[in-house]
Amino acid sequence: GDEIKIEVTFEKHLENKILKALFKSHAYEEVAYEIYELQNQHQNIGLGMIGELKNPMSEKEFLLFTKEKMECGGIRHSNFTGKEIKKVAVLGGAGSFAIKNAIQAGADAYLTADLKYHQFYEAENKLLLADIGHFESERYTKNYIVEYLRKKILNFAVILSEENSNPVKYL
């Protein structure tokens, strides 16, 4: 019969699932396949940011500073590593998928939101992992978006909402 060639681009973490599906659908034939890994040519483009503090802080000082500046009702965090905080990774919103990226980048701390219980173990002795709250982690983003739009679209009125839409309350 005729051979069919199918090409697919997928994220690395899906490789096993895709191969299982491929083998399952070709159970009676030997499957010819090749995998080419694509390397990101633009390492500075993506979600989140990483930077360094001018003055390193203890982990407790850093969390208290973050709580004040981000106006958090509370911060859930991993065990202290005993290291000073200098290099910080930040990803607004639900950022659990990037814990490994923050570790690989050599961050001392990773600020994000919506972490689940077991995800705090991923940081163990590697970095300080802090869940500062979804709304809190994104609260200032709108200011930067408005500033950017006002510079780029001069003939358009950009109005910043003052509405606080955080459904999460703290006691």
PLM feature spans:
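Hydrophobic structural segments
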Residues: G1-L171
